[in-house]
Amino acid sequence: MKTLRATIKGVGHYLPERVIENAEFEKTLDTTDDWIKSRSGIERRHFAAEGELTSHLAVKAAQNALTDAGLTIDQIDAIILATSTPDQTFPATATKVQAALGMQRGFAFDVQAVCAGFVFALANANAMILSGQARRVIVIGAETFSRIMDWTDRSTCVLFGDGAGAVVLEATETDGASSDRGILSTDLHSDGRFSDLLYVDGGVSSTQTAGVLKMEGREVFKHAVIKLAQTADAAMEKAGVTADQVDWVVPHQANLRIIKSTAQKMGVPIERVVLTVQDHGNTSAASIPLALSVGKARGQIKRGDLLVAEAIGGGLAWGAVVLRW
């Protein structure tokens, strides 16, 4: 008996042209390149140009993913966009992406789970494919976090960047074995008791302003390592695989120390972790699809590889996906 799986058909990304090296922050903040690198592993990040919106980044990443998949937009049933930095309060930025891509069928909507957004969006797309709601789905993570930074706060503004990544998921019949391609499991969590650890101090119904990012870095670090390892372990158990079988861990690229500590807790050597944080900074929901696309382009991620993607973000919200590339 055949089993339906949501398989990765294509992947792509887009990074804004403007690159900000750590040294630039030395001009306006009490910080140094060494200080930033030692605490985060970040060396540079990309910032969107004036007038360059989240939807613009998302469209370019989606186009690259479609090209990689060998598909046209007319063959897509749905678009799910993970973002915390939408173009407008409404409509959903995904519908602007839908229009820009020339898609006149199906449906498009946004998912907001901050840095965990892409994992949540991927789980949504997987469920829609398995239920027959859609056959092919573009899942995008796109962010312009440079628009919500407090440029006087050296503990946060040096950490984030802008960018977008996308994958095309396609329904595929398989034998249902863990060796078959596709999403093998998902694991999602949130706990609103910790919402004050990472948030933006603005909103439509509260302040009528966009606000700026606020973070209790040390507390987030402690929660991140424990929760990321736990959700990765839970997803692997659901998939019937073990850490020693994993070819690549593709983590949310927030902080190199978090990434290393989580990998150690999972029992995965850092050599089997896809790292892009040094070049991108924390791109929130865009970080995992960016890492998937860059990892493939580098020749790290190959067809048949077993991957674990895990992320945590404001909410707190966290989760993991196990998939066979």
Q: Where are each of the predicted segments found?
A:
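Buried hydrophobic positions in well-ordered alpha/beta secondary-structure cores of metabolic enzymes
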Residues: 8-10, 36, 65, 76-79, ...
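Flexible, glycine-rich active-site loops centered on histidine and acidic residues
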Residues: 130-163
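Conserved catalytic cysteine-centered active-site region
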Residues: 37-56, 83-137, 264-292
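Catalytic phosphate/nucleotide-handling subdomain of diverse soluble enzymes
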Residues: 290-310, 318-325
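Phosphate/pyrophosphate-binding loops at sites that engage ATP/ADP/AMP, CoA/4′-phosphopantetheine
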Residues: 30, 61-77, 176, 230-247, ...
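Active-site pocket-lining segment
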Residues: 220, 224-230, 243-266
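Acidic, glycine-rich active-site loops and adjacent beta-strand->loop/helix elements
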Residues: 13-14, 82-88, 113-118, 141-146, ...
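Condensing-enzyme catalytic core mediating Claisen C-C bond formation in acyl metabolism
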Residues: 1-50, 153-222, 226, 230, ...
